[in-house]
């Protein structure tokens, strides 16, 4: 059985300034966005320029931070932030929500499209294949931090991992389950899925490969966006069955988690967009 390495959350210390791994992974995601975006631009068949890509990143970063934080507040911890409203602005404390960040990026894409006289789908279809590797970097940051660990699994499974950071939650689970209590007494923590790495694979690497291949030739307007919505929604829905569920606005449930509730509209919206795109397949645009 594996044990989480318990990495130092600080990647680089420069005097009084500390750069944390999680923040560094966000930076990696933004750099990958620029690198992959420039690769697409150099291939041609796109209205985007390097200058437009830089502007798009600026708006995207604002959308990720503002939307991600607002999503964390509204979807996952509304009661806590109602009692501690000033902590809403402490983005380094308490995390951010992907689904909130996604909505923030949609709003940023709409504003960018209006400012540059582009179709909204031109922007989102261009962005879709640039996002997954950034998501993978973020999930890798979660793993390095030893947070958002997976659900309990049997200790004899080759993928079982002990997360010492989860001891508080482990104690609560062990108190109500004799089998868990035995495992906790034996190992000092409960064996869990390393669900962050599953998300790196499915939401990041696999989704990137699918979208990069799909956008390698011109597609009907909105199709790349539809593939992202459906692909991410399904990947997240599956991964949530291995991830320890968060307590959201619908309570704490092991049957269907908050992340799954939020992924269902993405899958539905993607299916609707795909059908709309097929009916307008003659309305193509350059990547």
From Swiss-Prot:
It is a multi-pass membrane protein. It is found in: Cell inner membrane. Its EC number is 2.5.1.145. InterPro entries: Lgt. GO terms for cellular component: plasma membrane. Keywords: Cell inner membrane, Cell membrane, Membrane, Transferase, Transmembrane, Transmembrane helix. The chain crosses the membrane at residues 17-37, 56-76, 88-108, 118-138, 194-214, 222-242, 254-274. Pfam families: LGT. A 1,2-diacyl-sn-glycero-3-phospho-(1'-sn-glycerol) binds at residue 139. Catalyzes the transfer of the diacylglyceryl group from phosphatidylglycerol to the sulfhydryl group of the N-terminal cysteine of a prolipoprotein, the first step in the formation of mature lipoproteins. Belongs to the Lgt family. This is Phosphatidylglycerol--prolipoprotein diacylglyceryl transferase.
